[in-house]
UniProtKB/Swiss-Prot annotation:
Protein name as annotated: ABC transporter glutamine-binding protein GlnH
One Pfam family it belongs to: SBP_bac_3
GO terms of molecular function: ligand-gated monoatomic ion channel activity
Keyword Transport: yes
């Protein structure tokens, strides 16, 4: 009886040991998967998937006639694909918003974010950034004839429109603490709300607001920019090889004239030195 009990006990320990080893192996595989090299996967798949805006005039906007997404960010992404994979047509695009872009990157839905994304210390905790590829500043868009001339005019009773998940939404609460902030899912919704009278001003980066003012001549930017908003291209944390390739591409673009060409095409002026 004791012998049978001992054999049963040994068998039980063996099962537990095997299960533990199997679990360790699975965790190891999961760990390896989470650290998978994005650049290597891009080269294996022969494509690079960028998360881009589709509602931001001048930077990323879907052309209703062709169905293609067009803008500054799109052209920059295409040139990165050309430098990494040899062909700009190997760039693929998925729509993101300020709210969805980081989760989509972390889930592996996209390889990189090129979507008017400001480099901040808070975001650096979640993603890694490339070098700055565009210098913007937060400003206000108002209807022509508005009494609002600067952020200082946004007092009690003022309503400011912003986009969820954006640094602009956070900044305006600090710069105009007495104003009410209404948040929307994207810039198109926020601009529609401004035009329908739901707010007194719309706030985001001046580069984005220029596109809105260009679209509707009844609106204009007012006051000076009240923040610095350096845009960067985001990749998953730890993907230093991909970030290095992107930085090399940006540097090459600026040295061979491609960057200036794209800048003038969309922003209609020379890049600031």
């Amino acid at each position: 009886m004791k012998k049978i009990f001992s054999l049963a006990l040994i068998s039980l320990f063996a099962v537990i040991l095997l299960a533990a080893c199997g679990s360790k192996g699975s965790n190891g595989e999961a760990s390896k998967e989470s650290k998978k090299d994005t650049l290597a996967a891009i080269k294996d798949n022969d494509k690079i998937v960028f998360g881009v805006k589709t509602d931001t005039r001048l930077f990323g906007l879907k052309n209703p006639s062709s169905g293609e997404i067009e803008g500054f960010d799109i052209d920059i992404a295409k040139q990165i694909a050309k430098d990494i994979l040899g062909d700009e047509k190997k760039a693929q695009f998925k729509e993101v918003t300020s709210k969805t872009r980081i989760p989509m990157l972390q889930n592996g839905d996209i390889d990189a974010i090129v979507a008017t994304m400001t480099i901040t210390e808070e975001r650096k905790k979640e993603v890694d950034f490339s070098d700055v590829y565009f210098e913007a500043g937060q400003s206000l868009l108002v209807k022509k004839g508005s009494k609002i001339k600067s952020v200082e005019n946004l007092g009690k009773g003022s309503k400011v429109l912003a986009v969820k998940g954006s640094t602009s939404s956070q900044n305006i609460r600090e710069k105009a603490p007495e104003a009410s902030v209404l948040e929307f899912e994207n810039y198109a919704e926020a601009f529609t709300a401004l035009k329908s009278g739901q707010g007194d001003a719309l706030t985001t980066d001046n580069a984005i607001l220029y596109g809105m003012a260009d679209e509707n001549k009844n609106y204009q930017l007012t006051g000076k920019p009240f923040t610095d908003e350096p845009y960067g291209i985001a990749v998953k944390k730890g993907q230093s090889a991909l970030a290095k390739e992107i930085n090399a591409s940006l540097k090459k673009m600026k040295s061979d004239g491609r960057y200036d060409e794209i800048y003038k095409k969309w922003i209609k002026e020379d890049p600031a030195e």
